[in-house]
Amino acid sequence: MPNVIISADSTCDLSPEQREHYQVRSFPFHIEFRGRDHLDNIDITPQVLFDGFYEDKSLPQTGACSPEAYRQHFAELTADGSKVVHFNLGSALSSAYENANAAAADMEGVYVIDGKSLSTGIGLQVLAACRMRDAGMSAADIAREASELHNRSHASFVLDTMEFLAAGGRCPTLVAYLGGKLSCRPGILVDNQSGAMKVGKLYRGKQEKVLERYVSDTLARYTDIVKDEIFITHSGVSDEVAAAVRKLLEERGFRTIYTTTASCTISSHCGPGTLGILFMTETPSA
């Protein structure tokens, strides 16, 4: 049986250690910042982007890679006869899936999955696919099952500031200004059927108390959460805040809790201080 390679856009936000352990091949997005082209989380970090914004309102340009870039990536992975299952950032958020699909159209043994999510909402799907690979499943069978994983993957997060959304034209400046004055922190939900984002509950108060309510609200929506693993993914919160959220999840019986930092692509849109919990359910649910 040919070797099966699991590959994913860098926006799946798995840590370097996870990518190495599970042998996931990462495809980095490009970040254009201050006139230079960078590779996401390779030669630029979210903190550099945040610093640039607060220094002189510099904003990065992010975007999906071209079909040709994907074609080259897939060609390198399949050169020895390997088969590839590749996970993309959700098609509702980016043209990455469309471009990767175009690249794979005339290539044998390359299967492209629309993650219909973002960040470790896709990372969870990638880990599930890796376990299928390690169990000896073929690339075609993995792709068939993986194409439905988004129905069980749940992603949400809470913003600490709306400045970056406003600067990027994703919410009115006045709304962001008033949100800051009123200490409003909007919850953002990812629709796991379409992959689109929508505004959820609006929280007010200090970050730690807001995150405590957010965790409680989020977990209360589901009765069949898989307790084997859960992600805490953030765009730069203090160790104390991350530890407090971890404690909440430990108290609720989660066995493995991963803490990862969001990629530049994700972080540049949500701004610093954003945090989310991302997990799977046993059965498909919105």
What are the residue ranges of the model-derived segments?
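Mixed-charge interfacial surface used for oligomerization/domain docking
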Residues: 3-5, 11-25, 30, 82, ...
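N-terminal glycine-rich anion-binding loop in soluble enzyme alpha/beta folds
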Residues: 5-64
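Short beta-strand->loop
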Residues: 88-89, 113-116
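Glycine-rich phosphate- or other oxyanion-binding loops that anchor nucleotides, phosphorylated ligands
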Residues: 57-58, 64-90, 99, 143
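Hydrophobic residues in alpha-helical segments
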Residues: 53-54, 78, 133
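Acidic, metal-coordinating catalytic cores used for nucleic-acid/nucleotide bond scission
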Residues: 93
